[in-house]
Design a protein with these regions (language model features):
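Conserved glycine-rich beta-strand-loop-beta hairpin in the small C-terminal domain of fold type I
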Residues: 280, 296-305, 316-332, 371
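Phosphate-binding glycine-rich loop
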Residues: 57-63, 74-119
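Active-site phosphate-binding strand-loop segment of PLP-dependent enzymes
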Residues: 142, 146-215
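Generic structural signal for small/hydrophobic residues in well-ordered secondary structure
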Residues: 19, 36, 53, 77, ...
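Conserved PLP-anchoring active-site segment centered on the Schiff-base-forming lysine
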Residues: 110-134
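PLP-dependent enzyme catalytic core of the Aspartate aminotransferase-like
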Residues: 161, 337-338, 347-356, 362-403
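Conserved core segment of the aminotransferase class I/II
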Residues: 224-298, 302-311, 394-395
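N-terminal "arm"/small-domain region of PLP-dependent enzymes with the aminotransferase-like
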Residues: 1-63, 354
Length: 403
């Protein structure tokens, strides 16, 4: 049989979907499962956005668009990024794709060369596709550790130590998946200072959760002197407007926009025209629903953090953004005799019917950081209350058995 490429062997997956398959299998068997696995809003896309898509269908907007995206969307995205970040972005700086995720690959392809030892620094724990794409594109992944003591940010001094002449790209994600951490302004300023001393490094700023900040204003690296020109801003419709299935994202960088356009031409041709017109309405239309979703997430965050900290053996920091918590379950693992977070996760699913993700689903476990699991609180208050109660009961019951 013909062989499969080594590049394909390097390609990983999103473990959230692996766990979701486990959950669906249990559901088919009639099990009662409360799931906190998937990182997508549990709201419908706002009606005005739905109506814009319906109009596009009825108006016959069914064909290809320019690979960079329709002008109306690039204009709307440029205005949105300029206003929300306090920077100057032009429509020609914008490229649209079928979701924000393709720009991870396009950015690595545009800034590194295959097999030459080019390095990409990325956050760990982090979105698993970062490391997967770095390896598959023939670059070397260099993790920078997020620490609980820093509210799940990294030490800028560690960044400076990790940059080498081979470093080509730095991936930043704030607010962050999986921890909900935010890079504070003082650290972002320190990162900018470090990058000024290392002009050979590009930056991929994954800002898909930019509108889901709860403690203070969102800070983008592009707001600091000299950073806009070398930063790829990546955003989209999925998280802010509950458009995960519409597959619509966009990136901005003046120098790389023509390169990204060629990659889109060679891979996707273009994003769905219907989704693009829906995104125009998302950016230009009323924002009441988006603000309402954000307020709901904030209330849920406060609820799940409070309840988690009442569970035996669990401590949970308050995340600054996104819709994830990253509770420390080190003591809980000891209490029930679980070797690590993955064993805890599996037992929690099979014995208590609560589905979460383990820290190892987001990269190698950070040394000396203990055991963690991820909750997505894109779930109802009732689900949060019942799910955390089940986890508490699970720990108490198994603690008694261990004793």
């Amino acid at each position: 049989m013909p062989s499969i490429s080594r590049r394909s062997d390097e390609l990983g997956t999103e473990n959230a979907f692996v766990v979701l398959a486990e959950v669906n299998d249990l559901l088919r068997k009639g099990k009662d499962i409360i799931s906190f696995c998937i990182g997508q809003p549990d709201f419908h896309t706002p009606k005005n956005i739905q109506e814009a898509a319906i109009r596009a269908i009825r108006d016959g907007k069914h064909g290809y668009t320019p690979s960079a995206g329709i002008v109306e969307l690039r204009e709307a995205a440029a205005i949105y990024l300029s206003r929300s970040r306090g920077i100057a972005v032009e429509p020609d700086d914008i490229v649209v794709a079928a979701g924000a995720k393709p720009f991870i690959m396009y950015s690595i392809l545009a800034t590194t060369d295959f097999g030459l030892g080019d390095e990409v620094i990325y956050p760990n724990p982090g979105f698993p596709i970062y490391e997967s794409q770095i390896r598959a594109m023939g670059a070397i992944p260099v993790p920078i550790h997020l620490r609980e003591s820093r509210n799940f940010s990294f030490d800028p001094n560690e960044l400076e130590q990790k940059i080498t002449p081979k470093t080509r790209l730095l991936i930043l994600n704030s607010p962050q998946n999986p921890t909900g951490g935010i890079i504070p302004k003082r650290d972002m300023e320190a990162i900018a200072d470090i990058l000024r001393r290392n002009p050979h490094v590009w930056v991929f700023a994954d800002e898909i959760y930019s509108q889901l900040c709860y403690d203070g204003e969102f800070v983008s690296l592009t707001q600091f002197a000299g950073m806009l020109e070398r930063t790829i801003i990546c955003d989209g419709g999925s998280k802010t407007w509950a458009m995960t299935g519409w597959r619509l994202g966009f990136a901005a960088n003046k120098a790389l926009a023509p390169v990204f356009t060629r990659w889109v031409t060679n891979t996707e041709s273009c994003a769905s025209q219907i989704s693009q017109w829906a995104a125009v309405e998302a950016l230009n239309g009323p924002q009441d629903d988006a603000r309402g979703m954000r307020d709901t997430f904030l209330a849920r965050r406060d609820l799940i953090v409070k309840l988690s900290n009442e569970v035996p053996g669990v401590t949970c920091k308050t995340p600054g953004g996104a819709f994830y918590t990253w509770p420390n379950i080190t003591e809980a693992c000891k209490m029930i005799g679980a070797n690590d977070s993955e064993e805890f996760r599996k037992r929690l699913l099979n014995e208590a019917g609560v589905a979460v993700l383990a820290d190892i689903h987001f990269g190698p476990r950070v040394p000396d950081e203990g055991q963690h699991i991820r909750f997505s609180y894109a779930a109802s208050n009732e689900a949060i209350e019942n799910g955390i109660a089940r986890m508490a009961d699970f720990i108490r019951k198994n603690k008694r058995k261990a004793a």
